[in-house]
Every structure is written in C-alpha cells, then in structure tokens.
Amino acid sequence: MQDGQRTAEDVDALARQVITDGGHGEWFRHRLGHGIGLDVHEPPYLDRGDRRRLVRGMCFTVEPSVFIPGRLGARTEDVVVVGGDEGGRLLTRYRRDLQVVA
C-alpha cells in the first residue's frame, strides 16, 4: 500500500469485494482492521465511513473474517505498515497453510 493512495474505507471495500466475489459477503460482518499505535485498537479503522487517508508509516491490522453461524468461522490477521513509492510492508510472519480444526 502506498502513501496517500487510499482511504481506510477504500481498503475495507476492496477486501469486502474479494470476499463477496468468493460467495461469502453476507458473512463478513466486522470491520477489516484498525490502527495500531499507542493503543492496540485505534484509528484509522478499516471500515465503511472512515475516510482518513492512509499515509506512510501508519501501522494497522488487516483481519478479514467470515463467520457462518452454526457452521464455521475463519479469520486471519496481519500487521502492515503503509510505505512510500515502494508500497507497504507486511510485518506478520507465520505459515499460510490452511489448518482445519474439527
């Protein structure tokens, strides 16, 4: 993600579209993420209505989730930093293979 290119609301909308295109839009009921700084949950909020521009150095979570009542729930969480011309930087390092818990 590049400095000043998108708002928090834009990023949320992009993620919602991907989840909707995958057939799970109605089950994505939470905001996409939030800022991390002096507090663990702070602005900007990656959600509808937050029109703040994301600028270089901002740190936030990206945590899309799908919860289908009585069936399943899934959430991933990454921490990212908005970059300059080079784009953003992913700070989270963990395995990406799917783990099914029955």
Predicted regions: what they are:
Residues 1-102:
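Active-site neighborhoods and metal-handling regions in enzymes and metal-associated proteins
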